[in-house]
């Protein structure tokens, strides 16, 4: 879709927490499949990862280190689930999305990255090996989520980040044409939209198609928005991802 060849890429950044490998980086696997020879590495910021990866790409371009960066978000959340836990297994899915970021375009109108340090609310335990020096009660590395805590954090993260993006860009929330939020669950989206007071038709929803596909939610939803007649040149789009860590990433851009 970008009309460029893999040989023209200067960098590949991949956001994933559920890749095919712990080592090497999943971005290296993407580079191999594409036949690209540029540097490639991963960003791990859970469901906020795509926005964090966008900011990394923008930084490389702004410093003149790259002209074209492939940003990928790819997740297989189903491999991290406990399938007897209906509080989590019914929410998640697998998916991927990607974007090519090029020099010469407009910089984002505003960027907001934040962390509210918390490693307990939403987590997947580390490797369970066979070392005799470290016993583990975990039989598998599966996802744990405190749903109530995630709900409260998610609503606040969306609303606070949207207001900060608008303020930094010198516009009002009402001036933002489209909202692409992390698709955690419908309750979080509905409550955030209600609190923000924005028209529901401005908010992209893809949950019924994919479920929660972690960092791939935002590029997938952005692609869905781009394929409709609702998006016009010059429209402003607010991207907000939030997830384990507890990390939040916000990006305000103008569509061309």
Residue positions per predicted region:
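Condensing-enzyme catalytic core mediating Claisen C-C bond formation in acyl metabolism
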Residues: 85-152, 156, 160, 242, ...
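Short beta-strand-loop/turn "lid" adjacent to the catalytic site in phosphate-handling enzymes
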Residues: 8-21
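Conserved active-site "lid/cap" helical segment
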Residues: 1-10, 128-177, 188-196, 221, ...
């Amino acid at each position: 879709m970008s009309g460029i060849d893999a040989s023209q890429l200067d960098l590949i950044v991949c956001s994933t927490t559920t890749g095919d490998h712990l080592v090497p980086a999943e971005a290296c696997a993407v580079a191999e499949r594409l036949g690209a020879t540029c540097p490639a590495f991963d960003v791990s910021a859970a469901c906020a990862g795509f926005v964090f990866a966008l900011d990394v790409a923008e930084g490389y371009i702004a410093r003149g280190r790259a002209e074209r960066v492939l940003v990928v978000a790819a997740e297989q959340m189903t491999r991290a689930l406990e399938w007897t836990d209906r509080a989590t297994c019914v929410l998640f899915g697998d998916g991927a999305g990607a974007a090519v970021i090029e020099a010469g375009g407009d910089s984002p109108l505003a960027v907001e990255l934040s962390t509210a340090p918390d490693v307990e609310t939403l987590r997947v335990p580390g490797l369970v090996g066979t070392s005799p020096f470290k016993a583990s009660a975990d039989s598998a590395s599966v996802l744990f989520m405190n749903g109530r805590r995630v709900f409260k954090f998610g609503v606040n993260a969306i609303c606070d980040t949207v207001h900060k993006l608008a303020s930094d860009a010198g516009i009002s929330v009402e001036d933002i044409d489209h909202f692409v939020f992390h698709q955690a669950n419908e309750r979080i989206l509905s409550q955030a939209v209600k609190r923000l007071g924005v028209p529901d038709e401005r908010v992209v929803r893809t949950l019924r198609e994919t479920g929660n596909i972690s960092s791939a939610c935002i590029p997938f939803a952005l692609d869905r928005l781009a394929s409709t007649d609702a998006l016009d040149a010059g429209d402003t789009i607010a991207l907000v991802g939030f997830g384990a860590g507890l990390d939040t990433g916000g990006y305000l851009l103008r569509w061309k």
